[in-house]
């Protein structure tokens, strides 16, 4: 067991890291274009932050959190998602006193004790954005557009934007009563998890993917869009109107409720149907009570999160290659102790000039070192042996063109720039 990563986790090896860099750099670039600034919050938070915001009876809190008691007898939890920590950060640092709205993005690992499967891990990575301090429907559309632009920048197509409104405290209670009455005669046909959801928050039954529950829900289930108050209905209509004006196609999904208690009004997901059961690439919505729930003043918010592992799965299916491996500039080959010492000085000079370079310190033969230079896929090899040292020169070989240059050591810096560019 000591030689294996824990179940549900995954090592990222050097040959894979360039894909991750591409995902992260694209996220940063798109976020900056939209005026978002990066925030970083702790890997673990007080457990109460999640029980109060995400919902004590939600699947995340009741089944999936990694919670522990520290030596100070405090209950702490590895963050299962990023919105609640972002809201806590907003309150703790009194950012409600700054000009509103404030716009953040974050990238980092999250943790949930979930059943590992394709694209789903117990330690996974999310890119998310949050906007605090705006009630306007334009803000909802802006974060949706940012998410769609992110996918487009990665080359993903064939995606669908699903949309719904989950109402607010004022209009949701009547809907929950109707939904509870509707499910009352169907409780024998729903799974055990949904029975628990039925007792605490019947809306979550709509989110179940199990066939028995989908059949129990049926086509006659009450839809929340028919119970929205005037404010929520107007907001939802405006969101749809703006999406249409931007030529952004969407599908109304009346069963889209998201799995977290803090959502209000707009809820959305971007899905890739060809992925199968785990087709959601990312999603989010509005959370107008979350900041207040975290101890701050009443402050509206909206945001999304997207799973990077799920995106990599989608890219693989679409055969989109994000490899952006930076090529090594120089591979140093030296034979003999004096030559090695001189080569080590030149190695430092090359790096100071901004070129990447490695040197074989293992005292292999010239032939063995040349093989390693080829395997390293370097642009140039620099060769320094006794003969070159006696002549105060070195040999630089263009590994692609096969051309070789003799470079005097006294003009090394100038010639390196000419040769390597």
From Swiss-Prot:
The UniProt similarity line reads: Belongs to the class-II aminoacyl-tRNA synthetase family.
Q: What is its main location?
A: cytoplasm
Describe the reaction catalysed, as an equation. Answer: tRNA(His) + L-histidine + ATP = L-histidyl-tRNA(His) + AMP + diphosphate + H(+)
Q: What is the name listed in the Swiss-Prot or TrEMBL entry for this protein?
A: Histidine--tRNA ligase
Say yes or no: keyword Nucleotide-binding present.
Answer: yes
Reply yes or no: does the keyword Nucleotide-binding apply. Answer: yes
- Where do transmembrane segments lie in this chain? none
Could you say which EC number(s) this protein's record lists? Answer: 6.1.1.21
Query: What Pfam families does the record tag this protein with?
Result: HGTP_anticodon, tRNA-synt_His
Source species: Natranaerobius thermophilus (strain ATCC BAA-1301 / DSM 18059 / JW/NM-WN-LF)
Task: Give the domain of life.
Answer: Bacteria
Which SUPFAM superfamilies did the record assign? Class II aaRS ABD-related, Class II aaRS and biotin synthetases
NCBIfam families, per the entry:
hisS (TIGR00442)
Cell location:
Cytoplasm
Q: Describe its partners and assembly state.
A: Homodimer.
What GO terms in the biological process aspect are recorded for it?
histidyl-tRNA aminoacylation
Q: Which CDD domains match?
A: HisRS-like_core (cd00773), HisRS_anticodon (cd00859)
Q: What GO MF annotations does this protein's record show?
A: ATP binding; catalytic activity, acting on a protein; histidine-tRNA ligase activity; transferase activity
The terms describing its cellular component in GO are:
cytoplasm
């Amino acid at each position: 067991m000591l030689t294996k990563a824990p179940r549900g986790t995954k090592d990222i090896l050097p040959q894979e890291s360039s894909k991750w860099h591409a995902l992260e750099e694209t996220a940063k670039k798109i976020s900056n274009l939209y005026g978002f600034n990066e925030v970083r919050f702790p890997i673990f938070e007080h457990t109460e932050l999640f029980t109060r915001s995400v919902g004590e009876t939600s699947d995340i809190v009741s089944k999936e959190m990694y919670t522990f008691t520290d030596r100070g007898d405090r209950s702490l939890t590895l963050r299962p998602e990023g919105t609640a920590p972002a809201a806590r950060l907003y309150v703790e640092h009194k950012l409600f006193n700054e000009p509103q709205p404030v716009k953040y993005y974050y990238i980092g690992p999250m943790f949930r004790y979930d059943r590992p499967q394709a694209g789903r891990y117990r330690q996974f990575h999310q890119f998310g954005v949050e906007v605090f301090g705006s009630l306007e429907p334009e803000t909802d559309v802006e974060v949706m557009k940012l998410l769609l632009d992110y996918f487009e920048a990665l080359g993903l197509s064939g995606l669908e934007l699903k949309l719904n409104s989950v109402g607010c405290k004022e209009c949701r209670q009547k809907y929950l009563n109707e939904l509870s009455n509707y499910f009352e005669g169907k409780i024998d046909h729903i799974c055990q998890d949904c029975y628990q959801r039925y007792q605490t928050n019947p809306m979550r039954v709509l989110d179940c993917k199990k066939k028995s529950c989908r059949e129990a829900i049926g086509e006659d289930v009450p839809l929340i869009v028919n119970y929205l108050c005037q404010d929520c209905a107007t907001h939802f209509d405006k969101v749809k109107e703006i999406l249409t004006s931007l030529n952004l196609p969407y599908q109304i999904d009346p069963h889209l409720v998201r799995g977290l208690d803090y959502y209000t009004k707009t809820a959305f997901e971007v899905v890739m149907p060809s992925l199968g059961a785990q087709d959601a690439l990312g999603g989010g919505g509005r959370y107008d009570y979350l900041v207040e729930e975290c101890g701050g003043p009443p402050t509206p918010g909206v945001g999304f999160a997207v799973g990077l592992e799920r995106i990599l799965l989608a890219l693989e299916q679409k055969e989109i290659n994000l490899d952006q491996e930076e090529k090594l500039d120089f591979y140093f080959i030296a034979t003999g102790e004096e030559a090695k010492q001189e080569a080590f000085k030149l190695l430092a000079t090359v790096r100071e000039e901004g070129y990447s370079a490695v040197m074989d310190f293992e005292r292999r033969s010239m032939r063995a070192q040349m093989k390693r230079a080829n395997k390293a896929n370097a642009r140039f090899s620099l060769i320094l042996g006794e003969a070159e040292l006696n002549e105060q020169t070195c040999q630089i070989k263009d590994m692609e063109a096969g051309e070789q240059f003799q470079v005097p050591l006294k003009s090394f810096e100038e010639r390196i720039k000419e040769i390597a560019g």
